[in-house]
Amino acid sequence: MARVYISSVIAAPAAKVWARIRDFNGLPAWHPAVAESRIENGEPSDKVGCIRDFRLRNGDRIRERLLGLSDYDMFCTYSILESPMRVDNYVATLRLTPVTDGDRTFVEWSAEFGCAPERESELVTTIGAGVFQGGFDALKRQLGG
């Protein structure tokens, strides 16, 4: 299994960051790579088991299932159902932890997945630097550096 782990600190209170990212259907509002998103079958976006179907700005389409969501622990876990990345058993978690020294937020985004061995390094870099760090950088621009 390939593993990706990216962390950062956002200069904004955890509650403010969580309010921005909590909506499982809200990626277009904060992640620059996502053009549009919808929750299938009209389900609530915070219902565990709901499926988001979103389109990236490059035209690619991805479907993901919400596996876990906690307002108390400020995390979201999801799996990829369909993706052009050709990964298997992809499960990721985005987690926030309050940093009380300065009222900042420690953010972590991790994933595990299966893929062809010759693609592992490329996928780890694309997901880590492009998707995860790209999302963190956008949140920093929107909420504080």
Regions found by a protein language model. Name each.
Residues 1-44:
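Hydrophobic ligand-binding cavity/cleft-lining segments
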Residues 2, 58-60, 88, 103:
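Short acidic/polar mixed-charge low-complexity motifs
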Residues 90-92, 109-111:
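One face of beta-strands
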Residues 106, 112-145:
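A conserved amphipathic terminal alpha-helix motif
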